[in-house]
């Protein structure tokens, strides 16, 4: 499912006014930029057939950076507003002048898109994620009667960023991140051992919630647990 767009210049600030302010702030600096970020994350943990935790978090803010010679000044705030930006500007203006200003060329405009603009958090309904974790638990217990405990977790996050420079160059990026972990404990003759497996990356949640993928994680976690159970002291 597509990512809900983070639009700092439509939601919080006037773009032209902000660009003018940035140029004024950095007029005596060698380099610098204005950075906006919004991040949302969700995690669910099922432990021993019970949903133990479910967390949803979100944050946003901006950072203003100026470089002059070997000195760097940085100001940031979780409040994206003109008032907060002006306060940050006052901090940046305290940067001592290095005398001769040397202009730094901006990064290349040729950028390779690495991630799809997706939001893995809203890709699946909350109830479907809970059902998935329960299915993982049931599947693990059905593989081996020695399984006494299963812990499964799924996490997803998305980071939206905007970078504004003084040359009117405006860049944005979306960075999704997903993770699925499985931990299995087996017990035999009073001895208990645990094995874990999982995977994730900057891609859609569906790539790791596919049965062929998560079953592989379960089997690997079980293999490690059984291997530990059968291990003998050196």
Feature annotation, model-predicted:
Residues 1-234:
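Active-site bordering "gate/hinge" segments
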């Amino acid at each position: 499912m597509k990512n809900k767009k983070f639009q700092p210049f439509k939601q919080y600030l006037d773009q032209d006014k902000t660009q003018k302010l940035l140029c004024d702030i950095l007029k005596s600096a060698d380099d610098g930029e204005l950075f906006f970020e919004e991040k949302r994350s969700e995690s669910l943990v099922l432990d021993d057939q019970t949903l133990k935790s479910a967390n949803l978090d979100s944050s946003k803010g901006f950072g203003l950076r100026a470089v002059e010679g070997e000195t760097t000044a940085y100001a940031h705030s979780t409040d994206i507003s003109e008032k907060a930006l002006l306060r940050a500007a006052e901090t940046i203006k305290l940067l001592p002048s290095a005398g001769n200003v040397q202009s730094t060329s901006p990064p290349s405009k040729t950028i390779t898109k690495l991630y799809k603009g997706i939001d893995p958090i809203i890709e699946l309904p909350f109830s479907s994620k809970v059902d998935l974790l329960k299915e993982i638990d049931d599947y693990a217990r059905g593989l081996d009667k020695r399984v006494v405990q299963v812990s499964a977790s799924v996490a997803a996050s998305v980071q939206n960023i905007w970078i504004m420079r003084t040359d009117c160059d405006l860049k944005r990026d979306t960075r999704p991140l997903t993770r699925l972990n499985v931990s299995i404990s087996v017990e035999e003759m009073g001895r208990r051992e645990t094995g874990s497996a999982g995977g994730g990356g900057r891609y859609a949640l569906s790539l790791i919630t596919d049965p062929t993928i998560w079953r592989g994680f379960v089997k690997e976690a079980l293999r490690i647990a059984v291997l530990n159970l059968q291990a003998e002291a050196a």
